[in-house]
Curated annotation (Swiss-Prot):
InterPro entries: CCT_CS, TIFY/JAZ, Tify_dom. Belongs to the TIFY/JAZ family. It is found in: Nucleus. This is Protein TIFY 11g. The jas domain (185-200) is required for interaction with COI1. Residues 101-136 form the Tify domain. One of its GO terms (biological process) is response to wounding. The lineage of its organism: Eukaryota, Viridiplantae, Streptophyta, Embryophyta, Tracheophyta. A motif (Nuclear localization signal) lies at residues 187-194. Its main location: nucleus. Residues 1-31 are annotated as: Disordered. The keyword Ubl conjugation applies.
């Protein structure tokens, strides 16, 4: 390196800095013949590069996507990940052999016990399996109970070209004292009648 400055405490300024280029770290060799032999690239001494790699602590859990810089200013490129680690990162795809990947799906609507259940993207094969399983469970329950009940389960699947119907939310009984049958309690009814009679008289 070529330096300009006084020996008695003056600032050392590299020649590259005088030309507007960034200064190079002192551990680099910058002989012009070595740079020309390397195609103009900066040549690092092998000892300095090995020392810099030892100083770098790389966490195995992080992905080293970009070159990193050690405390000495030495740039160390990331090491390629082992093949086993790369295979671990790939998501596993499980394909069920009985259901092709392009099976048409439709919403499945089940009405049971006053509740409406809607399942999106249900295949016809899965719906058939569900119906068979439900019939099996109902037959087992009817056989064990000894009752002569007629348990029918209806599974409705709309055609795929129709938009799904949205059901209104269930109506909650009003908190005004009206019961589910629409009959007011007798005491409130009598009180309301007295109020209306007095209002008519005024």
């Amino acid at each position: 390196m070529d330096a300009v400055g006084a020996a008695g405490g003056g600032a050392m300024l590299p020649a590259a800095a005088r030309r507007g280029q960034p200064p190079q770290p002192p551990c680099m060799t910058t002989a012009p013949e070595q740079q020309a032999a390397a195609g103009g690239a900066v040549i690092w001494p092998a000892a300095a590069a090995a020392e810099a790699k030892e100083k770098m602590v790389v966490d195995a859990r992080t992905m080293q996507l970009f070159p990193t810089r050690s405390a000495d200013g030495v740039v160390v490129s990331p090491a390629p990940a082992p093949a086993a680690a790369q295979e671990r990162r790939r998501p596993e795809v499980h394909v069920t052999p009985s259901v092709p990947a392009t099976a048409p799906t439709a919403p499945l609507t089940i009405v049971y016990g006053g509740q409406v259940l809607v399942f999106e993207h249900y295949t016809a094969e899965a719906a058939e399996k569900l119906v068979q399983r439900t019939q099996h469970l109902l037959a087992a329950a009817a056989g064990g109970g000894g009752g002569n009940k007629n348990n029918n389960v209806t599974v409705v699947t709309p055609p795929p070209d129709e938009p799904p119907m949205l059901l209104p939310p269930p109506q909650m009984p009003a908190a005004s004292g009206v019961s589910a049958g629409g009959v007011m309690p007798i005491a409130r009814k009598a009180s309301l009648q007295r109020f209306l009679q007095k209002r008519k008289q005024k």
